[in-house]
């Protein structure tokens, strides 16, 4: 059947990939039913890292974030991202905790740019890269909560292909935005043709339930607001008094002239637009300045001052004119002097409309300049500060960039996932922002040298960089307040420029005018703000070794040398979809799935073992006996003794595979 929607195709799209060597980005094509691809690895828990929180000090100010409870339910894994994702989605204990529970996924995958990085093997052929990413995206989709989102960080090499791949996996209707990050702070002199300044971050929702948090308002956002009239509602700014009209064939009811009470001029909304408010709402404000009434319709003037044709002008929409033009000017001036103006107000020559600060922040914008979220050079400085001048990555990401992503896509206590940990920036920022996190790293050298040490520093408050602290805010320090429209940042810049201009003129420095200007623009910086004080913890884990392999020369599935003891038990349990029973509780059986109990025998399954196991179960329970060798008659004996039970021969009954097609 022909596909009914647009899809990206590539070489071997119907195949799967397995690593050719543990701990590297090298892959081999295999059939999707090959046990080397299908095997579910478990997580082997190593040590648990516990941090400590630094008490508060009078030396600093503290943000609300500094008081968040440090999260301790975090997971740091050494292992290949695909195998880790399979463990998180397939191992019952992990699936229960993470499937459908992850609020935000951020990945900064290998860009496939054919560059040679010290910590990344990034030169993956396009079809391999697409297959690698497709399989991982399908697992990530299972992990995402219904209101979650995925953020994929890319450069020019694979961005266009990844967009189509994300459409295929998540649905094009769930596309949210393509965010553009200005990663460079200067042009590259070694660029061959163009110095690329940006990366892109593709964001997709898990479903229509996904909601993006709004951005907190900054001092710059609020700088345009003032209160020149003593408005009882607080600060405001003069916004556009006109609105675009979508009525093209006839006159909009709010397209008419208003006579100005002071100048007497007939004023119209902007061409192609209408007044922002309806007639009654406008009159409610205008009548505070002078009395208004409906006037005649001047067709010629209306055509000249709007985008209307004469045949579109409506005679039933009159202009608003002054009842007593002679007294209107004085009445209007008096009302202006009284202050606390209405929402549609009169100025000396025109009209204005008040707009108040929104109660909540503003929507995130898709352009992220480096002065807001940092750049590559800033990120490298953060790494150098943590690791004695080392530069382990060519393109690290600044903490401020991850801070914005995590703020927009999650809330404190939510789970954040990154399966390409690198230096651990995502987990570090998530911890500092009160989120739970799961991250994994493929390369053991990166894991032991950078990822884990960095996260340990974060927990022990030994990482003062990144988003840990914020410079104190620049605030007004004048006696009478800064002039309207002048922010503390504006005043500080003015003072800096003024000092440069007069630095070589001692007399000018002493002048009354300069001293007056400095006094009128005086600012100060508040205490440095601490956003993170350490604390929390994380579990360290690594992937279990493979227990199942395929021998092409024999064309059969084999058990590996690692398939022994508890490793074998846990592998069989996971691959059969059972949940482990705790070995310390002296259970006879190893695992349970509903009413079925699993026993793994590394050796021969006999009728005597079956009889013994049957004596240990309760009515209604069944037995799954997995053994490396099964004696004749054992299967029939178990089925007869305990209905619904079965024997699993290892490895053949777990993975039936043959390149000849007998699967």
For the regions a language model picked out, list residue spans one by one.
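Conserved S-adenosyl-L-methionine
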Residues: 3-10, 20, 126-130, 147, ...
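Generic, well-ordered alpha-helical scaffold segments in large soluble proteins
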Residues: 84-92, 105, 110, 136, ...
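Signature of N6-adenine DNA methyltransferases within the class I
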Residues: 146-147, 157-220
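PRPP-dependent phosphoribosyltransferase catalytic core
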Residues: 441-663
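Active-site-adjacent helix-turn-beta-strand microarchitecture at beta-sheet edges
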Residues: 207-384, 388
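DnaQ-like (DEDDh/DEDDy) 3′-5′ exonuclease domain used for proofreading
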Residues: 1-106, 111-127, 131-135, 139, ...
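Glycine-rich adenosyl-nucleotide cofactor-binding module
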Residues: 75-76, 377-415
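SAM-dependent methyltransferase catalytic-core segment centered on the flexible catalytic loop
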Residues: 86-149, 157, 173, 198-200, ...
């Amino acid at each position: 059947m022909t596909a009914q929607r647009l899809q990206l195709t590539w070489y071997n799209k119907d195949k799967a990939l397995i690593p050719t060597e543990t701990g590297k980005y090298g892959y081999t094509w295999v059939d999707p039913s090959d046990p080397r691809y299908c095997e579910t690895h478990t997580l082997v828990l190593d040590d648990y890292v516990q941090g400590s929180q630094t008490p508060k000090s009078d030396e600093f100010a503290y943000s609300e974030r500094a008081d968040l409870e440090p999260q301790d339910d975090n997971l740091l894994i050494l292992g290949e991202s695909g195998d880790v994702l399979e463990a998180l989605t397939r191992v019952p204990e992990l699936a229960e905790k993470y499937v459908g529970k992850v609020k935000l996924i951020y990945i900064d995958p290998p860009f496939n740019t054919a560059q040679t990085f010290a910590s990344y093997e990034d030169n993956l052929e396009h079809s391999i890269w697409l297959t690698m990413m497709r399989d991982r995206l399908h697992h990530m989709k299972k992990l995402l909560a219904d209101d979650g989102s995925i953020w994929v960080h890319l450069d020019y090499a694979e961005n266009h292909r990844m967009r189509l791949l994300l459409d295929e996996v998540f649905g094009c209707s769930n596309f949210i935005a393509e965010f553009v990050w200005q990663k460079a702070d200067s042009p590259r002199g070694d660029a061959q043709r163009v110095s690329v300044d940006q990366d892109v971050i593709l964001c997709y929702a898990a479903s229509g339930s996904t909601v993006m948090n709004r951005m907190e308002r900054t001092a710059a956002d609020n700088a345009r607001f003032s209160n020149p009239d003593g408005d009882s509602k607080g600060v405001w700014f003069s916004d556009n008094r006109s609105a675009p009209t979508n009525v093209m064939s006839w006159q909009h009811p709010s397209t008419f002239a208003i006579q100005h009470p002071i100048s007497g001029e007939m004023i119209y909304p902007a061409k192609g637009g209408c007044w922002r408010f309806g007639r009654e709402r406008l009159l409610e404000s205008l009548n505070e300045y002078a009395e208004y009434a409906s006037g005649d319709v001047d067709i010629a003037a209306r055509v000249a001052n709007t985008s209307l044709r004469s045949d579109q002008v409506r005679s039933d929409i009159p202009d608003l004119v002054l009842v007593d033009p002679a007294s209107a000017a004085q009445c209007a001036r008096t009302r202006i002097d009284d202050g606390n103006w209405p929402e549609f107000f009169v100025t000396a020559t025109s009209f204005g409309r008040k707009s108040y600060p929104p109660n909540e922040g503003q929507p995130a914008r898709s352009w992220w300049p480096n002065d807001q979220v940092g750049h590559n050079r800033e990120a490298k400085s953060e790494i150098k500060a943590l690791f004695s001048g080392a530069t382990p990555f060519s393109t690290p990401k600044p903490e401020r960039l991850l801070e914005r992503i995590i703020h927009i896509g999650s809330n404190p206590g939510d789970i954040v996932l990154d399966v390409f940990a690198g230096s651990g920036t995502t987990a570090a920022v998530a911890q500092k922002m009160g989120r739970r996190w799961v991250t994994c790293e493929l390369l053991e050298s990166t894991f032991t040298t950078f990822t884990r040490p960095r996260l340990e520093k974060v927990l022990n408050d030994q990482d003062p960089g990144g988003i840990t602290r914020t410079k104190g805010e620049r605030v007004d320090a004048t006696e009478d307040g800064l002039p309207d429209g002048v922010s503390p940042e504006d005043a500080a810049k003015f003072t800096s420029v003024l000092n440069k201009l007069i630095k070589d003129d001692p007399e000018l420095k002493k002048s009354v005018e300069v001293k007056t200007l400095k006094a009128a623009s005086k600012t100060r910086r508040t205490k440095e703000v601490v956003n993170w004080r350490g604390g929390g913890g994380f579990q360290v884990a690594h992937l279990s070794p493979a227990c199942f392999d395929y021998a092409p020369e024999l064309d059969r599935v084999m058990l590996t040398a690692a398939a022994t003891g508890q490793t074998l038990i846990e592998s069989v349990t996971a691959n059969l979809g059972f949940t482990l029973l705790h070995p310390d509780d002296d259970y006879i059986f190893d695992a349970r799935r509903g009413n079925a109990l699993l026993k793994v025998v590394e050796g021969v399954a006999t009728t005597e073992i079956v009889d013994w196991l049957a004596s240990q179960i309760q009515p209604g329970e069944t037995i799954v006996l997995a053994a490396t060798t099964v004696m004749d008659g054992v299967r029939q004996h178990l089925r007869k003794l305990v209905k619904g039970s079965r024997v699993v021969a290892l490895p053949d009954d777990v993975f039936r595979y043959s390149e000849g097609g007998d699967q």
